[in-house]
Regions:
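Surface-exposed, charge/polar-rich loops and edge strands
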Residues: 1-9, 13-17, 109-114, 118-123, ...
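Receiver (REC) domain switch-region micro-motif
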Residues: 46, 123-124
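Glycine/threonine-rich flexible loop motifs
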Residues: 58, 132-141
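N-terminal active-site beta-alpha-beta segment that forms phosphate/nucleotide-binding
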Residues: 1-118
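Short, surface-exposed, charged loop/turn segments at secondary-structure junctions
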Residues: 93-95, 137-144, 176
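Flexible, active-site-proximal loop/turn residues at the rims of small-molecule/cofactor binding pockets
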Residues: 52, 129, 191
């Protein structure tokens, strides 16, 4: 079995290799699939992520989706990585300045409103790779697994991965007891529930 570091390298290379116009077209398709799935109507309080401003890592940029959700009156929160290694969600306001963290990922200022885990209906999670059973391979920091693991499973929000189809692993990914599976994924190919 390939180790996680090798898998991360391989799948990050694949998403970085996508031309910018392909990434933009994929992001547009993901917005359409998000609303076709019914998620746009059912969920008012949404945890999402912000991508590096330079776009160098090839992650799906959610800017268009977040703008549309805010215009529909949805409450958006995005992660802030704390110095001690934890992740918390803070209210996102597109009109407020964002500060880049040590990973060059924009975050709201810590004076923004803190949002507790159980107050989210849905979390849109970034990922490096996923498989057809909902296993998510992240960047390796464990932030999302620790954050989601701290929420009682009965109160846990719906967890939807956002990815390019090229990030789909044709073989099962490694999975540990503390890993949290995705409930679904959205790629440019569509919405795929796992449960």
């Amino acid at each position: 079995m390939t180790n996680r570091s090798e898998l991360r390298r391989r799948f990050r290379k694949l998403r970085r290799a996508l031309p910018p116009d392909t990434r933009a077209a994929n992001a547009d398709s993901i917005v359409r699939h998000y609303f076709r799935s019914g998620l746009g109507l059912r969920n008012k309080r949404i945890g999402a992520y912000l991508s590096r401003r330079d776009g160098q890592d090839g992650e799906v940029d959610l800017t268009l989706l977040l703008e549309r959700l805010v215009s529909l009156g949805k409450q958006i929160a995005v992660p802030v990585i704390r110095r001690h290694g934890s992740m918390e969600f803070y209210a996102y306001d597109p009109d407020q300045p964002l500060l880049d963290n040590r990973f060059n990922i924009p975050e709201p200022h810590l004076l923004a409103r803190h949002v507790t885990g159980i107050s989210r209906d849905l979390i849109l999670a970034p990922l490096v790779a996923f498989d057809d059973s909902g296993v998510r391979l992240g960047m390796g920091g464990g932030y999302y697994d620790r954050y989601l693991g701290s929420i009682c499973p009965m109160l846990r929000p719906l967890i939807v991965g956002i990815a390019h189809e090229t990030q789909r692993s044709p073989t099962p990914l490694p999975f540990d007891a503390w890993d949290i599976r995705l409930d679904a994924v959205i790629t440019e190919a569509g919405w795929q529930p796992f449960r």
